[in-house]
Amino acid sequence: MKFDTIIIGGGLAGLLAGIRLQRAGQDCALISTGQSAMHFWSGAFDLLNRLPDGTEVDYPLEGMQKLPMTHPYSVIGAEKVLAYLRSAVETFGSFGCRTHIPEELCNIFRLSTMGSLKRCFLTMDDLLTTSSPEEPLCRRALVANLDGFLDFNTEFIAKGLEDSGSPCRTVTIRLEALKKLRRSPTEMRSTNISRILDRPTFKEYVSQIREKYDGEDLIVLPSIFSLADSGDAIQLGKVMNTRVRFVATMPPSVPGIEIQRG
């Protein structure tokens, strides 16, 4: 087979480069060793968190001016970096994945799988984030996990919320459709769960959450839904007049795999 361009690396850079070249009419091949970085995607991307001397960066585009001239950001220039980021948002949107860049072009913080706050820049719209680690993420939170799902540790998530000043309550959802998966922890993985959460099962899942809801202003769910179903979960929050947000699970990443396949 003949290709106009062969791209080595299946992460965000390689994926977006391949998409742009294909849209320009080129035949491309994307080569990666094992699973691509998108299989481990948290739902957010860093841009520039620290300078080489360890200084933390609040405004990445401004921080690029302090990088060595040989750094890729310095070579490309901050204006082009921002243009590429906006192009990435449009590309993700074409796959049904809604992402955004902070209005003030500053780093924000996402709640990680381990319950700690991590700096990031480009994030999924429905990912649980905050503009400052010193501000509570909510007044009261409800963290809902699936029975037998070990890749979403509610104790870590709850501690992270409580450390930020947000009281938290955890609940477990038990779905009959997942009974076979629960027999083996190795089968109870995010991608397998996502395939089973079809419309009837998803409605049952939503129904159980509504039963356990007790006026919290934030519902935290594991990021195990297809891009279409995650939109339905956000609609659930609107019906209940509360926010619904997701926290990344341990790999594999359902939204990352869907974007790669898209």
Question: Each predicted region: which residue ranges?
Answer:
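Generic detection of short hydrophobic beta-strand segments and adjacent strand-loop junctions
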Residues: M1-F3, I173
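N-terminal Rossmann-like FAD-binding beta1-loop-alpha1 element of flavoenzymes
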Residues: F3-L30
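General beta-strand structural signal in soluble alpha/beta enzymes
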Residues: I8, L30-S32, T99-I101, T170-V171, ...
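Cofactor-binding loop segments of dinucleotide-utilizing enzymes, especially the Rossmann-like FAD-
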Residues: G10, T33, L146
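Short, hydrophobic/amphipathic alpha-helical packing segments
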Residues: G18, L82-L85, Q260
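Predominantly flavin-linked oxidoreductase catalytic cores and closely associated redox partners
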Residues: A24, S36, F40, R119-R261
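Conserved N-terminal glycine-rich FAD pyrophosphate-binding loop of Rossmann-like flavoproteins
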Residues: T33-M69, A177-N192
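Dinucleotide-binding Rossmann-like beta1-alpha1 core, especially the glycine-rich loop
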Residues: L47-F149, F156-P167
